[in-house]
């Protein structure tokens, strides 16, 4: 019975992570709230890495054609300087540049963030900040395509992603808001945001391999972890496909409304 409870608990959290990871409402913030409301305590550091890896796998699957094209054209430009591959080569460079701020800040301030910025009230405040950003860009229609991006764009979007280390600040929301304020088209902002998710997640996973291997709960929670991984992967895939349709229709304001409601309720009642 206890094993069933653990499986059910991790199934719920896996579905929750998968649903909230792609959409701009902060998956990390919602996991904090879910654990608080349900009285759940996650045993071990591996769980967060596990579900992030599942979400990463779903993103890789959805953007596999973009990744293949970028890799092919990036290598082509390096060796042949083919003009038609230039924009993809620099798109890769800008992704690398945009990855740096979150990587550096995450390494330097991880302990501080874990200790002081993961409280429920902080999540409520951060959700309200996310709501404001989404409201500001609700009617924006930029003109920049992949080939129009600059180093300045990459740095600013990278700094926005670093802000999302705070639970309640949505990573996808922060990067899409920054990208659209810089004049990117919605589809360009969305693609840059989720392709940027890949190196950040891979980096975090590689840096934490030893934590996973040494997790004392890995043996006892193996089945619940597997269930959570599968649930997160499936739900992330569905949620990201849905969010891509929402972005195409320009309905980001509804996520703003949601973040306001949850943020206010969190500050009042939790």
From Swiss-Prot:
The Swiss-Prot or TrEMBL record annotates one GO molecular function as: undecaprenyl-diphosphatase activity
- For this UniProt entry, what's an example GO CC term? plasma membrane
Subcellular localization = Cell membrane
Please give, as recorded in its UniProt entry, the membrane topology of this protein: Multi-pass membrane protein
Q: What is its main location?
A: membrane
Q: Which UniProt keywords apply?
A: Antibiotic resistance, Cell membrane, Cell shape, Cell wall biogenesis/degradation, Hydrolase, Membrane, Peptidoglycan synthesis, Transmembrane, Transmembrane helix
Q: Name one Pfam family in it.
A: BacA
Q: Which residues cross the membrane?
A: 5-25, 42-62, 89-109, 117-137, 192-212, 220-240, 250-270
GO terms (BP aspect): cell wall organization; peptidoglycan biosynthetic process; peptidoglycan metabolic process; regulation of cell shape; response to antibiotic
Its Enzyme Commission number? 3.6.1.27
Query: Entry's InterPro entries?
Result: UppP
Could you tell me what this protein is called? Undecaprenyl-diphosphatase 1
Name of encoding gene = uppP1
């Amino acid at each position: 019975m206890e094993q069933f409870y653990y499986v059910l608990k991790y199934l719920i959290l896996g579905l929750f992570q998968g649903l909230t990871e792609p959409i701009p409402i902060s998956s990390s913030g919602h996991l904090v709230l879910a654990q608080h409301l349900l009285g759940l305590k996650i045993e071990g550091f591996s769980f967060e890495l596990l579900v992030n890896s599942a979400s990463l796998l779903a993103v890789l699957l959805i953007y596999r054609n973009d990744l293949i094209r970028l890799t092919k054209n990036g290598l082509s430009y390096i060796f042949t300087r083919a003009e038609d591959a230039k924009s993809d080569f620099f798109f890769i460079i800008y992704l690398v540049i945009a990855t740096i701020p979150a990587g550096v800040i995450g390494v330097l301030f991880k302990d501080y963030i874990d200790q002081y910025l993961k409280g429920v009230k902080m999540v409520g405040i951060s959700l309200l900040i996310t709501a404001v950003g989404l409201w500001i860009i609700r009617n924006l229609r930029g003109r920049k395509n992949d080939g129009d991006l600059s180093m300045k764009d990459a740095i600013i979007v990278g700094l926005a992603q670093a802000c999302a280390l705070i639970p309640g600040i949505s990573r996808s929301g922060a990067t899409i808001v920054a990208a659209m304020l810089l004049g990117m088209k919605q589809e360009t902002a969305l693609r840059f945001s989720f392709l940027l998710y890949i190196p950040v997640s891979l980096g975090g996973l590689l840096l934490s391999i030893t934590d996973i291997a040494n997790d004392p709960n890995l043996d006892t929670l193996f089945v619940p972890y597997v269930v959570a991984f599968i649930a997160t992967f499936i739900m992330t895939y569905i949620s990201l496909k849905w969010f891509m349709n929402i972005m195409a229709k320009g309905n980001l304001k509804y996520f703003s409304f949601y973040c306001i409601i949850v943020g206010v309720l969190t500050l009042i009642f939790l």
